[in-house]
Amino acid sequence: ESRELERLSRDAGTAVTARMYDAGRLSEVSPSLFARCRDRYADALDLAWRDLRYTGDGAHLDDIIAGLVDSLGGLGAGPRDVVEMHRQVLAARAEGLTQRQARALREEGRFLVLRVMGLLVDHYRRTALARVDAPTPPREAP
């Protein structure tokens, strides 16, 4: 699974499209901002995993994820950025865990990465709809 995540986050198949739109991986374009988002994602995963084990209420987790998605959306992050962030955090958090704990962490991570991706899509959809719904200023007569 780890190798597949790495392949997905580094797949060169979309490099041409990314260059066309002047988009690069967030970790390369702005390493410090990527690191901040990655740290927030790590906090979210830690909290989600803790809540799984101790049945917390998840309210604080929602706040962390919402802030993370707003940041990622504002930075123009894409799916590969989210997968790269997820892969790095999962690798760091899995060190020193038993196989059973690592499996539970990966499972919780799958839910989290899908949730973040879905919310990021919603963020972009809302942004696009806001542009479409925005009133256009009247044109001046020639």
Model region roles, listed by residue range:
Residues E1-P142:
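Non-catalytic regulatory/interaction regions at protein termini and inter-domain linkers
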